[in-house]
């Protein structure tokens, strides 16, 4: 009987651990890099995960240049109207350096009801905050722009993402026509996918659209 109780207790404890690991609440994410499409997608993915977990969560978006200590504490300290809060702080590079310790402390140990997302646009501005967040081992997603030679791979992945069959020549034709801007390329792939009833496109079609 004692063994049975012990087994139940262990099972319950393990389930609790799994729930804590899988939740995005009580966590912070730093999205760092200059590629805005990838940055937006990383933020959107975390917000969607938080919303799936708690559809009633309040979403608060802040701009680094407008944040002071009082506003940050108010946003991250919990809501009177919701049991959970998603806080996105854009351009943390613009935060006053006097806030670096406060932001780092919160990111290192967020309340269980908070999903915190910090967005840094790359570059050296706000480096002191990045150093602190790194030392605090805050989860980080790097969203740097791919090298030009890696752009065809990005296009191919976008095509698969949109269930579009693009051969090698079509991928290269799109790259040559539109260059290296990821947002432009992603929009072009979306257009090709929506205008291709058979889900397949070749180099000639790409040239017709964008050549």
Model-based region annotation:
Residues 2-211:
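Conserved beta/loop motifs at nucleotide-recognition and modification sites
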């Amino acid at each position: 009987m004692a063994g049975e109780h012990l087994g139940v207790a262990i099972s319950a404890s393990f389930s609790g651990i799994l729930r804590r690991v899988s939740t995005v609440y009580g966590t912070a994410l730093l999205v760092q890099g200059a590629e805005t499409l990838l940055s937006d997608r990383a933020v959107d993915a975390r917000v969607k995960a938080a919303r799936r977990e708690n559809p009633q969560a309040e979403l608060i978006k802040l701009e680094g240049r407008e944040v002071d200590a009082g506003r940050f504490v108010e946003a991250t300290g919990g809501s009177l109207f919701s049991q959970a809060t998603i806080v996105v702080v854009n351009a943390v590079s613009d935060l006053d350096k006097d806030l670096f310790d406060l932001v780092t402390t919160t990111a290192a140990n967020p309340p269980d009801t908070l999903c915190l997302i910090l967005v840094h646009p790359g570059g050296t501005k706000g480096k002191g905050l990045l150093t602190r967040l790194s030392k605090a081992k805050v989860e980080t997603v790097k969203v740097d722009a791919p090298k030009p030679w890696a752009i065809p791979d990005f296009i191919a992945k976008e095509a698969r993402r949109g269930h579009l069959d693009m051969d090698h020549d079509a991928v290269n034709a799109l790259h040559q026509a539109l260059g290296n801007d990821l947002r432009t390329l992603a929009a072009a792939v979306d257009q090709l996918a929506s205008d291709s009833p058979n889900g397949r496109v070749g180099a000639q079609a790409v040239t017709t659209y964008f050549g």
